[in-house]
Amino acid sequence: TLYRRKSTMARKMKTMDGNTAAAHVSYAFTEVATIYPITPSSPMADYTDQWATQGRKNIFGNTVKLVELESEGGASGAFHGSLAAGALTTTYTASQGLLLMIPNMYKVAGELLPGVIDVSARALASHALSIFGDHQDIYACRQTGFAMLCSNSVQEVMDLGAVAHLAAIEGRVPFLHFFDGFRTSHEIQKVEVWDYEDLKEMCDMDAVAAFKKRALNPEHPVLHGSAQNPDIFFQVREACNPYYDAIPDLVEKYMNMVNAKIGTDYKPFNYVGAPDAEKVIIAMGSVCETIDETIDYMLAKGEKVGAIKVHLYRPFSAKHLLAVMPKSVKTISVIDRTKEPGSIGEPLYLDVVAALKGTEFESVKVLNGRYGLGSKNTTPADIFAIFANEDKAGFTVGIVDDVTNTSLPRIETANTAPAGTTSCKFWGLGADGTVGANKNSIKIIGDHTPMYAQAYFDYDSKKSGGVTTSHLRFGKTPIKSTYLIDKADFVACHCPAYMNKYDMVQDVKDGGTFLLNCEWSPEEVGNHIPGQAKRYMAEHNVKFYIIDGIKLGKEIGLGGRINTVLQSAFFKLANIIPEDEAIQYMKEKALASYAKKGDDVVQMNYQAIERGANEVVEVPVPAEWKDCKDEVLGEQAVSGKPEVLDFVNNIQKPINACQGDKLPVSTFKNVIDGTFPQGTAAYEKRGVAVDVPCWNSEGCLQCNQCAYVCPHAVIRPVVMNEEEKNNAPAGMKVTPMTGMPGYYFTMTVSVLDCTGCGSCTNVCPGNNRNDVLKMASLETQMDEQKFFEYGLTVSDKPEVLEKFKKGTVKGSQFVQPLLEFSGACAGCGETPYAKLITQICGDRMLIANATGCSSIWAGSSPSTPYTVNKAGKGPAWGNSLFEDNAEFGFGMKLAQDANRAALKNKLDEILASTDNADVKAAIDEYYATYEDGEANAKATD
């Protein structure tokens, strides 16, 4: 459609993601890299560091000097200093990290220093944090004086990244080169790669020499950054105008140099579509690829549509925009990937409106819309809706806004991807290796066949054990489908528990293939999958296969790492490349990956590859499955506070069923400011562990060390009196309590919340003599769940705490943990400490949580693991930023001090005016315990 003409030079093809492409290009022009990691930009700095360590040379014949600072603010300060002293400098960042760089960006731009910031554009924290992609961060920089260049795909990151550096060097204006976080930064594509010699040929070495000559140097000293007074500041600020006026033409010049080398047609603004288009979309970022694909489909139907892809956003060149605008246009829709509350329109829209003013296009209708916030999936159906929209301004796509009615309804249609595109979708469990295996698969196919390949990985925010879906596409032409796969030729479910949680078989196209990893035989499997899945397979001629990856992994010695087994099964069934070739390529990858770990590990992976291909079993799909009825996936929560139940049933459960995209805006009317109820993680019951602890009362020392170290608070001691013991469910193991005559002890396990880490069995001292705690298959331990639930109903025993003391390892575990079932990794080392604190003083805690790992396992929507006790008290949790947590917490303390002081003043007034002895006694007790938190809490009950 747009760019690729016959190339005038051959470049190597490699399979890589956008971050790798950006790092490859930036390394060529970089002498110093000052960095601080932040998702999703971190891999760019990682690759730069790795290549420098390996001795890779830039185009100047030197290795890059990379330094990690204490924060993005520090990285930007060093970025400024390095440029000022004459080194071509690059940094990599996103989101909050980019915001911390803004003060230095003004300085760098004001001093006309040719630095480059590569940004994997990401949402900013507002009502909630989002690590996912949109343009909020880069728009916050549009006033800094940096030129801003956008790449819409992995290939464009490779191609246009060079333009940012080349134009910065000659033009003396720093560049912010950005591309969409995750959708481009982490999307893997087969791309053409620059050779550094070709980049060197385009670089203006005289401009490099001039830059170094202007640098701070005691051999020819100058002063940068003086303080100026009102008499001259304004004039000097305006004196830089010629440099900015020259940038659009300079960018065009270097784009033309790139075009001449590689046969492309890059421009500051690129038009695609009908030459006589009447409807035009203007956008920038990865959505342009989806728009391009959709336009191809619509042109084949004879529709007069087109799109303008923005590459050079700052300086915004009206001349270059107007040069590509079709004269026939009647309606322009400008879509922004950001939200500016209170503005008359988002930034790109306002720029376009201003650019059209006073031109032949001034009377053309210009509509504005928002899309894609926080990586919201934007599909061809949304693009059809935008083209169909005649009048609605301020619209949104990709959501249902039933509150302010901004949304356009999607217009579903046929598959817009080019004929011959094969799509595959994999449902995995976070940290089970599925994503890594699919990265290998895409690289095998991309690097060893002439096919184009694309891979994108969709995650939830759990640190591990969450849902991951891998989206792979293969085809004979470049793949522009920058949206999630809806219907796939091949679907695999790597976690059998998902079958009763998610509608995933419905992802398979008619006649497609479904692979299930499970321990069930072909005869049994039909008893374990829901009716709607069976009916869909029968009605849509789906080929059904199973493999017991868990059993194979254990037999081979790989444990729960089933990724290699299932990768081999995929190549066996998908018919993308010959099976024998795939096996050979997989073995080569295994050797390269594991050779350092010894031949035994390599041979185990070879076995996994061979057996994965050989032990796939086809399951006949009987005709009677067409008569199967729908089954409910996930039960409604029925116990708890009304506001919690409302949240769990109407928000949490749909999100956890991967149906969150379907929730309308009105669903969130009670949580618009990001306030969520505590304790909702307890309603998930994910059942993701393969093996869970099995407690044997004989030989148990009742030391509670297992509960003490449990990262997810799933194993808990319970003390019962005689009546509670007698009322316990049949089969519950109970033993007399040591040191407490008349009381009974049991250890309960919430097997559906367990992650199977084995920390409890590792620490158990009783295992030295007996199998007090051992790991057993989840399916054999399902009765333990009702025992755990019963344990939650027994009465508190203050006398037990009096005996064993809350300040001891044993005694602390008789207190309800107010952190439970978090999204932390199996075996996490952080959560046991946080859990313990809640057992000591959780009912009167305010938590200021810095952004990072602990904020993700503690506050990832929609599951909140901090919970409340039977009195409804528990930790109140808040998050501000990564860099200000001490101050944020200090602010909480100041508020508490102020509120308590105000209360004390009110009590002083009451005390002075009352004769009620009970009131006076209560106030006196409050005063007497004022500095003792626990005692004061009791005084206020």
Briefly describe each language-model feature range.
Residues V32-I35, V64-V67, S82-L100, P114-V119, ...:
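A short, small-residue-rich loop immediately preceding and capping a beta-strand
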Residues I131-G181, M205, G358-G372, E539-I546, ...:
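Conserved thiamine diphosphate
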Residues A582-I583, A595-C754, T761-L846, A850-T940:
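Ferredoxin-type iron-sulfur electron-transfer modules and their immediate structural context
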Residues F60-V64, F175-N270, E631:
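Conformationally flexible catalytic loops at phosphate/diphosphate-handling active centers
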Residues M148-A210, K365, S375-I411, M604-K626:
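Structural signature of the thiamine diphosphate
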Residues E252-V400, H471-R473, L484, A488-F490, ...:
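Thiamine diphosphate
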